[in-house]
Amino acid sequence: MKKQVLDTLRNSLLIAAVASVSATYSVAQTSNDYNKRELLWQVLDQSRANDYVPVFFNIHFKDKTGQKAVQSHIDWYKTTHVDFVNVKYEYFPEIQAVSSKKDWKNIKSFAPETWEEQLNVIRQLKHELGHEALIIPTVFSPLRVLIQTAGAQLSSDRDGRRRIVEIIKQDPKAIKPALEAVTKSLVYYIREARKAGADGFYISSQGDDLEEFGGGVFVDVLKPYDRQLSDVAAEVAPFNILHICESGGHFTTKTFDDYLDYPGSIINPPLHNWEGKGLSLADISKLFRRPVLGGLNNRSQALKEGNLTALKAEVDEILKDAPANFIFGADDSVFNDVNQELLRKLVDYIHTWRQTHKK
């Protein structure tokens, strides 16, 4: 408890320091006056709007480990001009193929060396880019990782995933020991990644959003493990994003109620897959009382077609009503084959939008 109080105090002092710096200078927030680390910190200072709009888009990189993975992240950051480095790691070894609910008890925690290749990627990215940009690894939910380690390692393996989901639905409480083991491993990774140079984490919550596991199953079975990752990230790191992943599910306005008590500096919600009337970015910022990351549909037809004019029109509509403290992004990862040169032009347009569109 004492450590959590100290961590909270530390984070408050960091944000206060940013606010002090912001107040000292009368110049606009631009990448000429501050580096991208400072510009992102300024989003957390809710005493003033951020007139520089940071941007975050990400993809699923083909190369997962080694120097190729490091270079893929560097190339994406430098080519697209996004404002922080999101480190993705999506491969988890199969621990135990699950064919019945009796098999859940055989799921054990990962060996520490499982994470070493990923930690090396973080160390190298910190060395190459840490002086100018925040290093923010993605941490996937215990549920997602459990499904992968139980036999559906690839997200494209829909049949495998469906089979495991059906086993879970037979007796959701039976997966608790397996969730405990996986969560323990993910907590270990968060702590080690922080030591390796991570400035914070992109925590991907995945439970209440899945139609198979909404309501009581999420609250009673999944949430205690799901939230634990956000709690640990908040304990060890000052800049964390809570990504509420829709994963093909359908949200209602009540869906967010289960996430209001999660820690996290910034909220990255789904906005384009609602049942009934949805919430706006401003609504969500007010609901969570935090800055929001998002706005663009990651399945945007204009993005798929590479239509910059249409994309700028979408940006205009989003930013004119966006909350004061805001990072522009998408609901989730964009197309892997997105035109990166086009994306850079869009990112540059967004960065200065509030300065070029002043009322």
PLM region spans:
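Bacterial N-terminal signal peptides that target proteins for export
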Residues: K2-L13
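Bacterial N-terminal signal peptides
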Residues: N11-S22
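Boundary at the C-terminal end of the N-terminal hydrophobic targeting segment
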Residues: S26-A28
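Active-site loop segments of alpha/beta catalytic cores
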Residues: T30-H60, D83, V87, T114-K359
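N-terminal capping/small domains of soluble enzymes
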Residues: R48-I107, W115
